[in-house]
Amino acid sequence: MSYIIDRRLNAKNKSAVNRQRFLRRYRDQIREAVSDAVSNRSIRDIDKGGKVSIPAKDINEPVIHHGDGGFNNRVLPGNKHFSEGDKITRPQGGGAGSGGKQASDSGEGEDDFSFTLSQEEFLDFMFDGLELPNLVKRQLSGIEEFKKVRAGIANEGQPGKINIVRSLRSANMRRIALTAGKRRRLDEVESELSELEAQPESSRDRLRYTALQEEAARLYTAINRIPWLDTFDLKYNLHIKQPIPRSKAVMFCIMDVSGSMDQATKDVAKRFFILLYLFLQRNYEKTDIVFIRHHTSAKEVDEDEFFHSRETGGTVVSSALKLMNAIIEERYSPEEWNIYGAQASDGDNWGDDSDSCRDLIVDKLLPSCQYFSYIEITPNEHQSLWRTYEEVRASYPDKFSLQHIIGVEDIYPVFRELFQKKVA
């Protein structure tokens, strides 16, 4: 009897390769299922893995079966209806090879295929194909991160980095340099010996002939004494550590918490900013996030207060934009930082403040920002702030974006639209 001992390193997850192949093959269907799951989850569970379902028809493999046409000769037991040589009509629908998997008034149908995604896999699909737009400013920061690059050839190094071609070339040049004079003299001696050997033996100068033979032997010995490869010849590939320029980015999350924002609207805004927060934390290690809440006045808050504070009031949107500009001037130089802004509001604003918002964005923020997005959350018609911002989008389509969210189901599609990776 044969025994098979499985010593694979991933013994607890032996089908990992097959699983990854499955996830790659049905990436589009899984991404759509993840999108549905994000829309239906609570805020607390939005970043967790779990069960997702894709239509079974999307994972069916192609099969080869008999077609409806053609003729076959078979020997079948006879009966009172058929005699020898009769042709039997092929039954209709018998070649599809499917007997149906559930009761249906239409005669066909299949259950969805359900499986579980880990948290890591779920987040991979959630943020697949997304990036911060225009992330171009790179600086050598104080972070100790390097990459190894080739820096030519060195005379010393590790045995594993020896450059064989350069070493042999160096050895060959050394041997040529050290033996050039001896080889030249050896050619002269051999030429003279050839002349003497061409003479009749009776008239040959024997003393001279013997002396030349002895000199040729000494030259051969001296040339062969030169080592074929010396430690001096060894050359090594040199690699040095080169500091990696880092992209320094900051995202300003601006949320309207005024009295016109009811609890449902605030929950939609929070879900959007949670998605943005997870996206930045997962994809960009060195990204600052500044949280700003505003009603009639604005203030910078921490993560916990941003998502859980119940403070409310009137609506003056420009207060948040002024605070954002002040923070940029104080802490984030546009020469070094990639600056982004995301603003969520129901669009309601006080009096003529919308014009002030437009002037602040055009004159102060957009010259410093790489990208600014405004998300209006309302099931009704657009408010004055949206109409004012449309003028800004018309003038700066690459740096300013507008999106409209009606309900929870629109959050994830809008998020992907804002941060979809641009094709070069």
Curated annotation (Swiss-Prot):
Family: Belongs to the UPF0229 family.
InterPro entries, per database record: UPF0229 (IPR006698)
A Pfam family assignment: DUF444
Tree of life domain: Bacteria
Annotated protein name in UniProt: UPF0229 protein CJA_2563
Cysteine disulfide partners in this protein: none
Region (Disordered): 61-112
HAMAP family per UniProt: UPF0229
Protein source organism: Cellvibrio japonicus (strain Ueda107)
